[in-house]
């Protein structure tokens, strides 16, 4: 078995409905440009507020993917 190296990037997803949808949006959007995603870790949840009401849920997600060298 060969050694593997993984890279981690942080993305923030948003949703007007829930934190779960916000996290899903973050992962699905990242998957459009990153290959071989492995693990998503929700590291922070917050909301945006306007006029005293929650308008969007936000999920900050660290996503790991397999690093491919240019060699």
Model-derived regions: residue spans:
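Basic/polar N-terminal segments that are highly enriched at the extreme N-terminus
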Residues: 1-2, 71
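Short, well-ordered alpha-helical segments
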Residues: 4-38
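Broad gene-expression machinery/nucleic-acid interaction feature
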Residues: 6-8, 44, 56-62
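Short, conserved loop-to-beta-strand elements that form functional interface hotspots
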Residues: 40-49
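C-terminal structural segments of small proteins and small subunits
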Residues: 52-71
């Amino acid at each position: 078995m060969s050694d593997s190296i993984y890279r981690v990037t942080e993305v923030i997803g948003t949703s007007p409905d829930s934190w779960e949808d916000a996290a899903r949006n973050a992962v699905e959007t990242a998957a459009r440009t990153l290959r071989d995603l492995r693990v998503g870790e929700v590291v922070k949840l917050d909301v945006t507020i306007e006029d005293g009401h929650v308008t969007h849920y936000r999920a900050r997600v660290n996503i790991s993917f397999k690093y491919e060298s240019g060699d």
